[in-house]
Amino acid sequence: MADLPQLIQKAWQQRALLHAAAGQNTYRIFHGFSEGLPGLNIDRYATTALISHPAALHDDLTIITATLLNCHSFDLIVSRPQKQPAKVLRGTAPTIPLEVLDNHIKFQIEPLAANPGLYLDARPVRTWLKQHSENRRILNL
């Protein structure tokens, strides 16, 4: 897809405030549905990029990886095709969970697992919970 690098670069630039935010190194870089390419999502977890994509975009992974590396020096880039196991495109698979920050809260994720362990779409709920749970313990089921 010829305009794929431009779409990803534009999305990266639009998130400049997130890149610079203290206590925040985890967020969605590219949301395909709203950015012109349904099915493709790219999430940032600190120095890791997770590319969730349909099988039809498999041939574009080299372009996506190169574009992401032009935006940021990711240590690890992982492809997560729908209904298939994750695959490392760049870097080395971690042997322990990775620590990331979301709204100054530390989380541990496993980028090669079917579920990395942190839903980025739930940030508003976590923010509300943080505001309303000071000095309390929270059980996450």
Where are these regions (language model features)?
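Cysteine-centered catalytic environments shared across enzyme families
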Residues: 2-24, 53-55, 61-80
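Solvent-exposed alpha-helices and their adjacent loops that cap or buttress functional pockets
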Residues: 130-132
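Conserved class I S-adenosyl-L-methionine
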Residues: 134-141
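Non-catalytic accessory regions of SAM-dependent methyltransferases
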Residues: 1-46, 95-97
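Pocket-edge structural micro-motifs
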Residues: 31-33, 53, 109-111
